[in-house]
């Protein structure tokens, strides 16, 4: 009979749940292994077939590690705050909490149907007050450490969108919201900010401590953007007490500076704009406020700008340089001011060409007739730097600046502090009170969690504040002395819960602390973290930042949270495009589980190709995987679903070599997460097993253990058919005998007069005389030696017989 996946999979899922098979308890006498998936956002669409790929990979590792004697922590939870739930609630009038919980229930059912070995007792949900109590508590530690502060930040403000709201850079196109096409303006708004820049160097340096893809490390380094250079001070003409500070990585080009550019929002713009240029500057500032940072810094964008009417003095040669404003300079980067060297920077070159500003050559032999030159060479027109290369000239100029109090060496970062507030309802409340006397205080720790109030009115306030500003009985507070204050109405971003959730899994029911020292010391760090490459920068950077803060506070034992990171590839539609509802190419795993079973889906997704590569969904491949599942079943089970008689204790040795080869290769490939090649070897073993009359039970048990991480339901059923009463989960992983891998036969090449005439199989280490006789007796060789005089025979044992015949 065929393998009945519906009955067998339900049977074993019920068994695992009833027996809490995958429950992880702290056991200091046992080595641990912590395998973690990036927890999902529980969307209304439910799982698609891309989710199980990463989940199956961590499950294979978890199941193998348990069998290798490790105490495995393998949890699952929900990153459940998010804008889609709020938008759905606004559209339908339903509460986002109810919508989210319904989605979580659906996700959980789908995940459980796939047989993953999660410890469900450790499930976390970022929207649960018992969880976000500790998100708020960590925020309070950041605040006490001076790492959380309020600041006026330029944001994208859409006054006509959703009643007036802030939108992200990615939601802006051509000065309008992508959804609805509402006008967007740049305006300063009070925001909470986390000082991630204080950890910039450590976030770069500690990448050396982890086993991550080099591409991800490089993306993080580039995002942080550490650059060494100098700050240069340019005194303003007519007001020498006012100086414009500029950061440059090329202090050696100071002699080539021909103008200075300020961002339109830079704090000195109004002060430096002369009356005759005021109208023009104000108009330009208003136009710039309609563009996002992404649009403004597009290298292909036509350069725009206006002159302020003021000048600065170049400290190195006393030249007057005009001060312009242009939107290609951002107030949020560096000091919001740049010294423009058109001969060495293409953006400056384009700007200078458009506005007819001087372009001064400073590198000998550089052709600047068509564009800027940023290569090395000897300096010219550069005073005391003439004749020096770039490296030497940089250092000499920095020395000069420091000696003349005109500047100093400086390290700058592309990384900006993390804007941590959102003008939304559906997020963690920030535990802060603003008192009428102008002071700010944290909600006392013993009053946490500060719960999100229930309200039917989650419409944007229209003022830029979050909808929480509308909940007056929640917002207004009084202390014991009658002092009035207002609660912070901004909420935390969705990144907050995911910046520490892996720590909560180690001790999820602790009401006294986010996790006990004992649990953290035992389970930390995460040994394997698997998720999509789209989180290569922000989530991983924020998580590392919070972890390092907690490390500095003595609350976690490791500098880094995730030791090994793997990014699984994307499962594309059969048309090689990304799966999406709009393209109609989404495959629902529920349908696959119903038709073929979870083991088939798991097998297929691990066999599609290397885990890190993106591959298209292929129904033929899925059908082929199911055929192999049935083939494995028939190998061991007869038509009455009983173990075949040829599975016995008799071992004639015919499978010994291939069995040991399979144990070795599958173990090594699983460890390297090369699941597709491990499955190929399992297929080789099954093919060989079908060729023999007797199936030694010890080999069959070992084989079933090896398929258990990928096909756990079938493996459990087959294990029970061997008469075993315990789950296969904790059975010892099979080992191989190195002696059985030794080749007992070799292929010898036979050459006659330098040309290969035959390849002969013979026993390994056959002596020279016998090898010579076998070679000369070979029928094909004799065609080239008959009637000839054998002058010489050279034998290289186990490799070659070389015959010289005349």
Curated annotation (Swiss-Prot):
Principal place of residence = cytoplasm
Q: Name one GO biological process term.
A: leucyl-tRNA aminoacylation
Reported EC number(s) for this entry are 6.1.1.4
Recorded GO MF terms: aminoacyl-tRNA deacylase activity; ATP binding; leucine-tRNA ligase activity
Query: Gene Ontology cellular component?
Result: cytosol
Concerning PROSITE patterns, the annotation shows: AA_TRNA_LIGASE_I (PS00178)
Task: Write out the residues that bind ATP.
Answer: 581
Which stretch carries the motif 'HIGH' region?
A: 40-51
Q: Which Gene3D superfamilies match?
A: 3.10.20.590, HUPs, Isoleucyl-tRNA Synthetase, Domain 1
Q: What class of enzyme is it?
A: ligase
Pinpoint motif 'KMSKS' region by residue range: 578-582
Q: Which family does it belong to?
A: Belongs to the class-I aminoacyl-tRNA synthetase family.
Q: What is this protein called?
A: Leucine--tRNA ligase
- Please write the reaction equations for the catalytic activity of this protein: tRNA(Leu) + L-leucine + ATP = L-leucyl-tRNA(Leu) + AMP + diphosphate
Q: Where in the cell is it found?
A: Cytoplasm
> Which keywords has UniProt assigned to this entry?
Aminoacyl-tRNA synthetase, ATP-binding, Cytoplasm, Ligase, Nucleotide-binding, Protein biosynthesis
């Amino acid at each position: 009979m065929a393998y009945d996946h519906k009955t067998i999979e339900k049977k074993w899922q019920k068994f695992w749940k009833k027996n809490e098979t995958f429950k992880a308890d702290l056991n200091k006498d046992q080595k641990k292994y912590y395998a973690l998936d990036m927890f999902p956002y529980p969307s209304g669409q439910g799982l698609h077939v891309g989710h199980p790929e990463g989940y199956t990979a961590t499950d294979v590792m978890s199941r193998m590690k348990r069998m290798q004697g490790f105490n495995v922590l393998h949890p699952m939870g929900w990153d459940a705050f998010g804008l889609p739930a709020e938008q759905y609630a606004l559209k339908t009038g339903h509460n986002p909490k109810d919508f989210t919980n319904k989605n979580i229930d659906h996700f959980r059912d789908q995940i459980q149907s796939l047989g993953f070995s999660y410890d469900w007792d450790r499930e976390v949900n970022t929207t649960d007050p018992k969880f976000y109590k500790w998100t708020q508590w960590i925020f309070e530690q950041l605040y006490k450490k001076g790492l959380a502060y309020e600041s006026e930040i330029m944001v994208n403000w859409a006054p006509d969108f959703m009643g007036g709201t802030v939108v992200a850079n990615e939601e802006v196109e051509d000065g309008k919201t992508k959804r609805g096409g509402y006008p967007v303006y740049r305006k300063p708004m009070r925001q909470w900010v986390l000082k991630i820049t204080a950890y910039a160097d450590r976030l770069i340096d500690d990448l050396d401590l982890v086993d991550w893809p080099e591409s991800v490390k490089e993306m993080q380094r580039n995002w942080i953007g550490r650059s060494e250079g100098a700050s240069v001070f340019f005194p303003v003409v007519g007001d020498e007490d006012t100086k414009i500070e500029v950061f440059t990585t090329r202090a050696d080009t100071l002699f080539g500076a021909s103008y200075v550019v300020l961002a339109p929002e830079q704090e000195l713009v109004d002060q430096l704009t002369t009356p005759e240029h005021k109208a023009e500057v104000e108009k330009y500032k208003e136009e710039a406020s309609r563009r996002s940072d992404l649009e403004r810094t597009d290298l292909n964008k036509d350069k725009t700008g206006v002159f302020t009417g003021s000048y600065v003095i170049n400290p190195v040669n006393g030249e007057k340089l005009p001060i312009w404003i242009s939107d290609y300079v951002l107030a949020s980067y560096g000091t919001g001011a740049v010294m423009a060297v058109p001969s060495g920077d293409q953006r400056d070159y384009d700007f200078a060409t458009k506005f007819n500003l001087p372009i001064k050559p400073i590198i000998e032999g550089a052709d600047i007739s068509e564009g800027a030159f940023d290569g090395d060479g000897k300096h010219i027109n550069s005073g005391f730097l003439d004749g020096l290369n770039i490296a030497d000239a940089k250092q000499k100029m920095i020395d000069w600046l420091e000696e003349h109090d005109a500047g100093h060496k400086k390290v700058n970062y592309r990384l900006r502090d993390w804007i941590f507030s959102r003008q939304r309802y559906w997020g963690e409340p920030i535990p802060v009170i603003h008192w009428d006397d102008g002071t700010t205080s944290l909600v006392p720790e013993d009053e946490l969690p500060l719960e999100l109030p229930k309200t039917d009115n989650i419409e944007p306030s229209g003022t830029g504040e979050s909808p929480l500003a509308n909940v007056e009985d929640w917002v207004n507070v009084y202390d014991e002395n009658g002092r009035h204050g207002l609660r912070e109405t901004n909420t935390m971003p969705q990144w907050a819960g995911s910046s520490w959730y892996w720590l909560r899994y180690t001790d999820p029911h602790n009401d006294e602390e986010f996790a006990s020292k004992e649990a953290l010391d035992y389970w930390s760090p995460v040994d394997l973290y698997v998720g999509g490459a789209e989180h290569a920068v922000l989530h991983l950077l924020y998580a590392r930042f919070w972890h390092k803060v907690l490390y500095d506070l003595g609350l976690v034992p490791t500098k880094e949270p995730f030791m090994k990171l793997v990014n699984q590839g994307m499962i594309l539609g059969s048309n090689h495009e990304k799966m999406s509802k709009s393209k109609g190419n989404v495959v629902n795993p529920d349908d696959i589980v119903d038709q073929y079973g979870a083991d088939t889906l798991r097998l297929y997704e691990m066999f599609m190709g290397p885990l890190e590569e993106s591959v298209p969904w292929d129904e033929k491949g899925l059908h082929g995987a199911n055929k192999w599942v049935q083939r494995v079943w028939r190998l061991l089970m007869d038509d009455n679903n009983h173990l075949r008689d040829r599975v016995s204790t008799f071992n004639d040795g015919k499978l010994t070599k291939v069995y040991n080869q399979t144990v070795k290769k599958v173990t090594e490939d699983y460890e390297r997460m090369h699941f597709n090649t491990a499955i190929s070897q399992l297929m080789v073993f099954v093919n060989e097993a079908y060729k023999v009359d007797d199936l030694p039970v010890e080999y069959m048990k070992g084989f079933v253990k090896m398929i258990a991480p990928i096909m756990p339901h079938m493996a459990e059923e087959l294990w029970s058919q061997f008469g075993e009463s315990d789950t296969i989960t904790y059975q010892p992983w099979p080992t191989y005998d190195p002696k059985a891998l030794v080749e007992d036969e070799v292929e010898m090449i036979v050459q006659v007069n330098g040309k290969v005439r035959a390849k002969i199989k013979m026993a390994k280490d056959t002596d020279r005389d016998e090898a010579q006789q076998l070679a000369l007796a070979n029928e094909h060789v004799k065609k080239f030696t008959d009637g000839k005089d054998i002058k010489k025979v050279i034998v290289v044992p186990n490799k070659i017989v070389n015959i010289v015949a005349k």
